Curated annotation (Swiss-Prot):
Organismal lineage: Bacteria, Pseudomonadati, Pseudomonadota, Gammaproteobacteria, Pasteurellales
Gene: secB
Subcellular location: Cytoplasm
PANTHER family: PROTEIN-EXPORT PROTEIN SECB, PTHR36918
Protein's recorded name: Protein-export protein SecB
Binding partners and assembly: Homotetramer, a dimer of dimers. One homotetramer interacts with 1 SecA dimer.
Gene Ontology BP terms: protein folding; protein tetramerization; protein transport
SUPFAM superfamilies listed in its UniProt record: SecB-like (SSF54611)
Family to which the UniProt record says this protein belongs: Belongs to the SecB family.
Organism: Histophilus somni (strain 129Pt)
Length: 171
C-alpha cells in the first residue's frame, strides 16, 4: 500500500481526507496495589470497575492531540479490599484534514481512540502482570457505538431544550 493510499481514508467531493498518526505516547500512568501483600492471601474473586473517557485538544491547523483515559479499579468480592488501581492516559498527535463538523468529531472520538486503545490495553496488562496479579485482558471497545450513543444523547438534549423553550413561549 502506498503512503498516499495509507493517508487517504476516503475521498468526498474531490477533497482528500487525511488521517495521519504523528506520534503515540504515554502521557500519564499509575499503578497502585494498596493492600499488598495480604491481598494475595485471599481467594482471587475480583470485581472490576472500568472507566474510559477521551479528551481532544486542537494544537494547530489540522493537528490534534487525542488522549484516551482508562481507569481500572479491582476490588475483592466480599471484603471490598482494593487489589489494584491502574490508570493510563495514552495519547497521540494526529494530522487530520478534509473533515468538518460531525465527521471530524467522529474521527476524534472514535477512529483516533480506536488506534490508541491497543497501546493502553497492552500497558495496563503489563502493569497488572508486574504486580504479579492474574492476567487482565481488556475486551475491545466499540468506539463507533459510543459515538452514536453520544450523538443520540446530544440530539435528545437539544430536542428537550427546544420543547422547554416552546412551552415557555406558549405561557
Amino acid at each position: 500500500m502506498t503512503e498516499k493510499n495509507q493517508d487517504a481514508v476516503t475521498e468526498e467531493q474531490g477533497t482528500e481526507v487525511v488521517l495521519q498518526i504523528q506520534r503515540i505516547y504515554v502521557k500519564d500512568v499509575s499503578f497502585e496495589a494498596p493492600n499488598l501483600p495480604h491481598i494475595f492471601q485471599q481467594e482471587w474473586k475480583p470485581k472490576l470497575d472500568f472507566n474510559l473517557s477521551t479528551e481532544t485538544t486542537h494544537l494547530a491547523e489540522d493537528l490534534y492531540e487525542v488522549c484516551l483515559n482508562i481507569s481500572v479499579e479491582t476490588t475483592m468480592e466480599g471484603s471490598e479490599d482494593v487489589a489494584f488501581i491502574c490508570e493510563v492516559k495514552q495519547a497521540g498527535i494526529f494530522a487530520i484534514s478534509g473533515l468538518e463538523d460531525v465527521q471530524l468529531a467522529h474521527c476524534l472520538t472514535s477512529q483516533c481512540p480506536n488506534m490508541l486503545f491497543p497501546y493502553a490495553r497492552e500497558l495496563i496488562s503489563s502493569l497488572v502482570n508486574r504486580g504479579t496479579f492474574p492476567a487482565l485482558n481488556l475486551a475491545p471497545v466499540n468506539f463507533d457505538a459510543l459515538f452514536v450513543e453520544y450523538m443520540q444523547r446530544q440530539q435528545a438534549q437539544e430536542e428537550s431544550k427546544a420543547e422547554e423553550k416552546e412551552k415557555k413561549e406558549v405561557h
